From Swiss-Prot:
Enzyme class: translocase
Residue numbers binding Mg(2+): D563, D567
Gene3D superfamilies named among the record's database cross-references: Calcium-transporting ATPase, cytoplasmic domain N, Calcium-transporting ATPase, cytoplasmic transduction domain A, HAD superfamily/HAD-like
Gene Ontology CC entries for this record: plasma membrane
Entry's Gene Ontology molecular function annotations: ATP binding; ATP hydrolysis activity; copper ion binding; P-type divalent copper transporter activity; P-type monovalent copper transporter activity
Protein function: Involved in copper transport.
InterPro entries in alphabetical order: ATPase_P-typ_cyto_dom_N, ATPase_P-typ_P_site, ATPase_P-typ_TM_dom_sf, ATPase_P-typ_transduc_dom_A_sf, HAD-like_sf, HAD_sf, P-typ_ATPase_IB, P_typ_ATPase
Active site: D365 (4-aspartylphosphate intermediate)
Topology class, membrane: Multi-pass membrane protein
Gene symbol of the encoding locus: copB
Full protein name: Probable copper-transporting P-type ATPase B
TM region(s), chain numbering: 30-50, 55-75, 93-113, 125-145, 282-302, 313-333, 621-643, 647-669
Length: 672
């Protein structure tokens, strides 16, 4: 199957003011400009000093003028056009500075040519054609290299888009196979995927079994065994067997497209630090122009040498690099959000990366976050002579049969495993923070937790409850006619990575807090095993939100980790909301960060990525600002008295290097 680049996702973010110039344009312009520049360099003296390889003959100055004019308008076009764009948006920056520099050099050289050839003056006026040629060449080469570096720092989205194949094998009538374009695939179509091929769309396996490599899509390092009715993600690699997949999502609704959309949006949103760097970069233009003009005036007063003074002005204009400052944060952001996406960490809100450095407490739901959420039934019992234990289990399963809560799934699966049939329930309603109610076989039933029994003054066996709860069971009761008629106790397994995650949080001076609707005994048992000392149990959904508010009222920064749907109010209330175990449903509204997998270690991965991201941002900001603070005065000739003078060509090299260093530094960002 062919692969394509999904062009609509390629230009996912704007890195500075020349994002509309492809690096290929700079490459071709550089080599064509080199053809015009070489004769200028050979025929024209540098700063009036003739170099050993240079020659001149009658009419050579006219050749230099013609070639320099072509070079100025052809090789200089990206900078002149860029300056026009910047000025039209009232945001003059690097392109305007470069355009000013080459324009001053070219216009003054025209004046020098006139003075030397038509004025009749006996004194020779030095031109800047040599400097103009080398300046344009270096700037084109620098931008070509820079665009490659910038592209490498932020092109992970393009790589994600390329994971999707261009075509797929679709099953049509009588099991005939037809290769069609991805755009011709629709929901409920059946596609066949052979070993080693990319899964073309999100879907469900309807035939066959295989192992799937999701590492490039969700960051899952191990191959995942998939069989009938299992979900597969478009872009993942089919490992060992041929499978037939029923399409469940196409185009923009697919997992990869949603991820790319979210990452694209996050990269284009500006954080506070980026807004500050943009503002400073904007001021830098006026700073450079001011220093350039001041240096020109000062050197004219000191030496009365227009050539030297003009060289200072041009060097200042080309050496100043607001671009390095402007790219300092966007490049790191592009790299960071892309790394996150490849590892199943979808960063929706850019500011969460900055806030993560100041988190004091991480509050977590127990079920599904710290524990597997796969509940096994350890005990069930009838409390009425009218129904035996199996009939009580059947009623539990009936009422829970339409729910996707982990407790409900555990009961239904257990009943199926024991071949116990159950009826279809009627009028089922959730009771928030309690359980649910409904009608089964004309019986009005409720499944509730122990908090409900206590608050409603129901009579129940408290000793039995305590014994089961201390074994780590979540306990539910069945009520009919205000009588407790049955009990079911379910055990959950703590995730292997939970204990390490809690240990890592404590080592970072972040306090883990458990918030759960489960009973206190179970919560305490899990908390003690994990080393969590701060536990809040038997909570209603609104209780979690109010607890977060209480902690925040003391000035603490809170990150909440929980279910993107059930814990939505808490995720929104927290300083950072992290929705865990979203799977392919990454379009969850609540949550600044979305964890595709239900792996607690991804919480630490996010904190590590955030820390490394901020470190790179600070490094780039210091470099971008520090470079300009040092380079601009040097270009102005502040150390000329000790012989340290920078030519425009050297200034251009330094300016290009400054941006390349920022891009390379961003590219070295790692998850851990």
């Amino acid at each position: 199957m062919e692969h394509h680049s999904h062009q609509e996702h390629e230009n996912h973010t704007s890195h500075g003011n020349h994002e509309h110039h492809h690096h290929g344009n700079f490459k071709s312009k550089f080599f064509i400009s080199l053809i015009f520049a070489i004769p200028i360099i050979i025929l024209s003296p540098m700063m009036g000093v003739k170099l050993p390889f240079q020659i001149s003959f009658t009419g050579s100055d006219w050749i230099v003028l013609i070639l320099a004019t072509i070079l100025f308008f052809y090789g200089g076009k990206p900078f002149l056009s860029g300056a026009k764009d910047e000025i039209s948006t009232k945001k003059p920056g690097m392109m305007t500075l470069v355009a000013l520099g080459i324009s001053v050099a070219y216009i003054y050289s025209l004046y020098a040519f006139y003075m030397n050839n038509f004025s009749g003056s006996s004194t020779h006026t030095m031109d800047f054609f040599w400097e103009l040629a080398t300046l344009i060449l270096i700037m084109l080469l620098g931008h070509w290299i820079e665009m490659n570096a910038v592209g490498n720092a932020g092109n992970a989205l393009k790589k994600m888009a390329e994971l999707l194949p261009n075509t797929a094998v679709k099953l049509i009538d009588n099991n005939q196979r037809e290769e069609v374009k991805i755009s011709d695939i629709h929901i409920d179509d059946i596609v066949e995927v052979r070993a080693g091929e990319s899964i073309p769309t999100d879907g469900i396996i309807v035939r066959g079994e295989t192992s799937i490599d999701e590492s490039l899509v969700t960051g899952e390092s191990k191959k995942v065994h998939k069989t009938h009715n299992d979900d597969v993600i478009g872009g993942s690699i089919n490992g060992s067997g041929t499978v037939q997949v029923k399409v469940t999502a196409t185009g923009e609704n697919g997992y990869l497209s949603q991820v790319m959309g979210l990452v694209n949006q996050a990269q284009n949103d500006k954080s506070k630090a980026e807004l500050l760097s943009d503002k400073v970069a904007g001021y830098l233009f006026y700073f450079a122009v001011s220093i350039g003009l001041i240096s020109f005036i000062v050197w004219m007063l000191i030496q009365n040498n227009v050539d030297f003074a003009l060289e200072r002005l041009v060097t200042v204009l080309v050496i100043a690099c607001p671009h390095a400052l402007g790219l300092a944060i966007p490049l790191v952001t592009a790299r960071s959000t892309s790394i996150g996406a490849h590892n199943g960490l979808i960063i929706k809100n850019r500011e969460s990366v900055e806030i993560a450095q100041h988190i004091d407490y991480i509050m977590m739901d127990k079920t599904g976050t710290l524990t597997e959420g796969n509940f096994s039934v350890n005990h069930y019992e009838s409390f009425t002579d009218e129904l035996n234990n199996e009939e009580i289990l059947s009623l539990f399963a009936s009422l829970e049969s339409n729910s996707n809560h982990p407790l409900a799934t555990g009961i239904v699966d257990f009943a199926k495993g024991k071949n116990i049939s159950y009826a279809t329930p009627q009028e089922v309603n959730n009771i928030p923070g309690v359980g649910l109610e409904g009608t089964v076989d004309n019986k009005k039933l409720k499944i509730v937790n122990v908090s409900y029994l206590d608050k409603s003054n129901f009579d129940y066996n408290k000793e039995q409850f305590t014994n089961l709860a201390q074994q780590g069971n979540s306990i539910s009761y069945l009520i009919h006619d205000r009588q407790v008629i049955g009990i079911i106790a379910q055990g959950d397994k703590i995730k292997e990575s939970s204990k390490q995650m809690v240990s890592d949080l404590l080592s970072r001076n972040i306090t883990p807090v458990m918030l759960t609707g489960d009973n206190k005994e179970v919560a305490q048992t899990v908390a003690e095993e994990l080393g969590i000392s701060d536990v809040h149990a038997q909570l209603m959904p609104e209780d979690k939100e109010s607890i977060i508010q209480d902690y925040q009222s003391n000035g603490s920064k809170i990150m909440m980790v929980g279910d993107g749907i059930n814990d939505a109010p808490s995720l929104i209330r927290a300083d950072i909301g992290m929705a865990i175990g979203a799977g392919t449903d990454v379009a969850i509204e609540s949550g600044d960060v979305i964890l595709v997998k239900s792996n607690p270690s991804d919480i630490i991965n996010f904190l590590s990525l955030s820390k490394n991201t901020m470190k790179k941002m600070v490094q780039n900001l210091w470099w971008g600002a520090g470079y300009n603070v040092i380079a601009v005065p040097l270009a102005a000739g502040i150390l000329a008295s000790i012989g340290l003078i920078l030519s425009p060509a050297v200034g251009a090299i330094l300016m290009s290097l400054s941006t390349i260093i920022v891009a390379i530094n961003a590219f070295t960002l790692k998850l851990k």
